[in-house]
UniProtKB/Swiss-Prot annotation:
Annotated Gene Ontology cellular component terms: glutamyl-tRNA(Gln) amidotransferase complex
Lineage: Bacteria, Pseudomonadati, Pseudomonadota, Gammaproteobacteria, Moraxellales
Protein name as annotated: Glutamyl-tRNA(Gln) amidotransferase subunit A
Stored NCBIfam families: gatA (TIGR00132)
Residues making up the signal peptide according to the UniProt record: none
This enzyme's EC code(s): 6.3.5.7
Length: 498
């Protein structure tokens, strides 16, 4: 029972169904680990342990009464960007340090309906703006593989909690790589679905045309289990799209059942030289190419494709995302909710001081740059031009997919770097260089672990799919994981028993 946290989601489901352990025992096991070890990681902002124990007892009773929901009684946790009724929702910011949402985000409701048990809210970069989880008002998150290193961001708390064995799966959000990059840094699998696949209702907005919720776990199957209840059309989200509802878990099982010695026979994997250019760490490149070689050995065909120069994509993203952020975050003014400065002289002073004191440096930086891009005299030259380039980026992906089924690249140019390295903003932004194009195009993509550096830090490979092809991506990663053991490696903290 001391290693329950090392079990996969499928193993947890089987264990609960076969009465090897109860949901309460499982929940208590995770809570015990969190209480003993999270002081080293700082992955949680808010704990909901007592509520979780109550829900676990209820889940055990429902199972006895014949409830067959597969995820009934399985613990998880939410990134603190998703509104949770009656529970603190901070978005990692002083601005929302006292905000208790009056409603649940749609994905929170859906996951609750599936019977899962939330253990709390997870740390994150402030308002999802960052790539290292050092901008959180609640302190930096530490990487469970090496606590002197960053976990990635902005879903760093989610990645760290799963990698540390505090929860089997967690929700995340991805605006420019915020699920995939921390998944890479923490040795996990993490998927960003097609834009519109998962409701954004109740997810605090950063850049509305780019934000998308997704799932994180140790394996593709873990991700599939959590993603399943998250998807579906939501009339409360104008960007939610009605589309076929796949059964991800069944799709993965079917793919595995029909796979032969060459499970990837007929699969064309596109590889762009633009993803293997300057700035890519040697060990990361070696691991990515070794993974592609393994795909080839298992029957895949590697096809050379061309995509937009990542530096152009990066410039486009950092014009559009801050512009949307400056608009979205204008609602935080010290009047209706959130942080309010003390003793304002007048309304202008209230606005100015509440926002200056409530937002951290990185959020202020992006608001300022976004406001500049939207200002009179610069709107056409910057924002409109970036939107036109965005359309060309979409076209380049469409052209690439005419010759391949999925596109592969390193998830990030480096493995996790040290906490406190104090990278300048431009250098930090380059950490997203391989992931942001996916968000600009609205495509699905995942990161899967493919090895470790000589320092023992995880490396991820990104797989990009065509619209609505999450099953293709998850199945591809799942079959790869049937023939490799990268996803079975555990972090230093996960190996600790309590």
């Amino acid at each position: 029972m001391s290693e329950l946290h090392l079990l996969s989601t499928q193993q947890l489901i089987t264990g609960l169904q076969d009465k090897q352990f109860s949901s309460l025992e499982l929940t208590d096991h995770y809570i015990k680990r969190i209480n003993a070890l999270d002081s080293k990681i700082n992955s949680f902002i808010t704990h909901t342990s007592e509520t979780a124990r109550t829900q676990a007892k209820a889940a055990d009773e429902m199972r006895v009464q014949g409830d067959k929901r597969p995820l009934l009684g399985v613990p998880m946790a939410h990134k603190d960007i998703f509104c949770t009724q009656g529970v603190l929702t901070t978005c990692g910011s002083k601005m929302l340090h006292n905000f208790i949402s009056p409603y649940d985000a749609t994905i929170v409701t859906n996951i609750d309906k599936a019977g899962m048990i939330s253990l709390g809210k997870l740390n994150m970069d402030e308002f999802a703006m960052g790539s290292d989880n050092e901008s959180s008002y609640y302190g930096a998150v530490h990487n469970p593989w090496n606590i002197g290193h960053v976990p990635g961001g902005s879903s760093g708390g989610s990645a760290a909690a799963v990698a540390a064995g505090f929860v089997p799966v967690a929700t995340g959000s991805d605006t420019g790589g915020s699920i995939r990059q921390p998944a890479s840094f923490c040795g996990l699998t993490g998927i960003k679905p097609t834009y519109g696949r998962v409701s954004r209702f109740g997810m605090i907005a950063y850049a509305s045309s780019l934000d998308q919720a997704g799932s994180m776990g140790r394996s593709a199957m873990d991700c599939a289990y959590l993603l399943q209840p998250m998807i579906g059309h939501d009339p409360r989200d104008a960007t939610s799209i009605k589309y076929d509802m796949p059964d991800y878990v069944q799709d993965l099982n079917d793919a595995a059942a029909s796979a032969g010695d060459k499970p990837f026979a007929g699969l064309r994997i596109g590889v762009a030289k633009e993803y293997f250019s300057k700035g890519l760490d040697t060990e990361v490149e070696q691991a990515a190419r070794a993974a592609l070689k393994k795909y080839e050995e298992l029957g895949a065909t590697i096809v050379e494709v061309t995509i937009t120069d990542p530096e152009i994509t990066l410039a486009t993203y950092y014009m559009l995302a801050p512009a949307e952020a400056s608009s979205n975050l204008s609602r935080f003014d010290g009047v209706r909710f959130g942080y309010r400065c003390e003793n304002p002289k007048d309304l202008i002073d209230l606005y100015t001081r509440s926002r200056s004191e409530g937002f951290g440096p990185e959020v202020q930086r992006r608001i300022l740059s976004g406001t500049y891009a939207l200002s009179a005299g610069y709107f056409d030259a910057y924002y409109i031009k970036a939107q036109k380039v965005r359309r060309l980026i979409v076209k380049d992906f469409e052209d690439a997919f005419a010759n391949c089924d999925v596109i592969a690249s390193p998830t990030a140019p480096t493995a996790a770097y040290k906490l406190g390295e104090d990278l300048d903003p431009a250098t930090m932004y380059l950490g997203d260089v391989y992931t942001i194009g996916v968000n600009l195009a609205g495509l699905p993509a995942l990161s899967q672990p493919v090895g470790l550096t000589s320092a023992g830090l995880p490396i991820g490979l990104q797989l990009i799919g065509q619209y609505w092809q999450e099953s293709k991506l998850l199945s591809t990663a799942h079959l790869f994981q049937q023939h490799t053991d990268h996803h079975l490696q555990h972090s230093t903290i996960a190996k600790e028993t309590v």
